């Protein structure tokens, strides 16, 4: 079991129950899923690019991503409906906890010129979205084997009802928010 999952069950639940005055353990916010999304617009011109993106995402997430396709044709971007334009993966359970641990302990500290995560990236329902500019911050990515530096979106979906609860949950996991 991942360290963060143990920490959640042993200390975070008690902390949040005390802070927000919950009457039941089931009211305590928890992380439900983490979604990683990588937009690969240049895959329209070169199909190999998508294979590299899928390989990188598989290494980072530990499971194979789903290739996302264009819903509409857009002449300005030279894409047609059904063209592969990205990939995404949804992590739940044990893989989710392991990824979160790697993200907080290893990947985020490796971001260049990092000054803390923005606390304004909550959506009003306690879910947190962040962007990563380089996939090379993850230790699973071999710098010599990448074809291009790509970014990705990371969305942490929680069962929190408000941004305050969501922030308290992520703070308990030592997320480095800006002060």
Swiss-Prot record:
InterPro entries (UniProt xref): Ribosomal_uL5 (IPR002132), Ribosomal_uL5_bac-type (IPR020930), Ribosomal_uL5_C (IPR031309), Ribosomal_uL5_CS (IPR020929), Ribosomal_uL5_dom_sf (IPR022803), Ribosomal_uL5_N (IPR031310)
GO cellular component: ribonucleoprotein complex; ribosome
Keywords noted in UniProt: Ribonucleoprotein, Ribosomal protein, RNA-binding, rRNA-binding, tRNA-binding
Molecular function terms from GO: rRNA binding; structural constituent of ribosome; tRNA binding
Ribosomal protein listed as a keyword: yes
GO terms for biological process, alphabetical: translation
Top-rank lineage group of the source organism: Bacteria
Pfam family membership, one: Ribosomal_L5_C
Job of this protein: This is one of the proteins that bind and probably mediate the attachment of the 5S RNA into the large ribosomal subunit, where it forms part of the central protuberance. In the 70S ribosome it contacts protein S13 of the 30S subunit (bridge B1b), connecting the 2 subunits; this bridge is implicated in subunit movement. Contacts the P site tRNA; the 5S rRNA and some of its associated proteins might help stabilize positioning of ribosome-bound tRNAs.
Family per similarity comment: Belongs to the universal ribosomal protein uL5 family.
Subunit structure: Part of the 50S ribosomal subunit; part of the 5S rRNA/L5/L18/L25 subcomplex. Contacts the 5S rRNA and the P site tRNA. Forms a bridge to the 30S subunit in the 70S ribosome.
Official protein name in the record: Large ribosomal subunit protein uL5
Organism of origin: Shewanella sp. (strain ANA-3)
Top-level taxonomy: Bacteria, Pseudomonadati, Pseudomonadota, Gammaproteobacteria, Alteromonadales
